[in-house]
């Protein structure tokens, strides 16, 4: 089971390659032999989702099973499945982010890799910082969170 936590500042080179941090690379090697799926996020946030292959194989059939006559479901399928790229970390622990995904998330050199338990999000550093600045002021706490003690 995945337990991805923390935020990591990383860089992407001009060819679209990025080195996965050592700790994350070790977790991915143990969990899935370094085989991952990178895809577009369906939310309004412009970031990418990085799944270890076993987690993706649990999620993929659920997305495929959505009613394709429903416009919102079809859009979700096209966005997530249509942009999914199965890849394997190279010997140096790097991945090549496809140009279409770089464009979707406005990725440039400086990036943030953010752990969310079963997956990671990959953000441009600029978008991540803007999200953090805006989120505290814009969002109300969901009722489920009111009983949570941190």
Swiss-Prot record:
Q: Provide the GO biological process annotations.
A: negative regulation of DNA-templated transcription initiation
Range of residues in the leader sequence: none
What are the UniProt keywords, alphabetically?
Answer: Cytoplasm, DNA-binding, Repeat, Transcription, Transcription regulation
InterPro entries linked: MraZ, MraZ_C, MraZ_dom, MraZ_N, MraZ_sf, SpoVT-AbrB_dom, SpoVT-AbrB_sf
This protein's GO cellular component annotations are:
cytoplasm; nucleoid
Where it mainly occurs, coarsely classed, is cytoplasm
PROSITE patterns given in the database record: SPOVT_ABRB
UniProt GO molecular function: DNA-binding transcription factor activity; transcription cis-regulatory region binding
The disulfide bonds in this chain are none
Q: Name one Pfam family in it.
A: MraZ
Where's the SpoVT-AbrB domain? 7-55, 84-127
Say which family it is in. Belongs to the MraZ family.
Q: Which HAMAP family match?
A: MraZ (MF_01008)
Subunit architecture: Forms oligomers.
Q: What is this protein called?
A: Transcriptional regulator MraZ
Q: Which organism is it from?
A: Marinobacter nauticus (strain ATCC 700491 / DSM 11845 / VT8) (Marinobacter aquaeolei)
């Amino acid at each position: 089971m995945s337990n991805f936590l923390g935020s990591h500042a990383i860089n992407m080179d001009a060819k679209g390659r990025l080195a996965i941090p050592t700790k994350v690379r070790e977790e991915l090697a143990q969990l899935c032999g370094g085989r991952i799926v990178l895809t577009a996020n369906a939310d309004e946030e412009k970031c990418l989702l990085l799944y270890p292959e076993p987690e993706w194989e649990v999620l993929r059939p659920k997305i495929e099973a959505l009613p394709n006559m429903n416009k919102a479901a079809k859009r979700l399928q096209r966005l997530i499945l249509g942009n999914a790229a199965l890849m394997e970390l190279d010997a140096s622990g790097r991945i090549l982010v496809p140009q279409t995904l770089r464009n979707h998330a406005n990725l440039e050199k400086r990036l943030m890799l953010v752990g969310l338990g079963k997956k990671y999000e990959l953000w441009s550093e600029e978008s991540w910082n803007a999200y953090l600045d805006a989120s505290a002021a814009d969002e109300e706490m969901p009722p489920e969170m009111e009983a949570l003690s941190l």
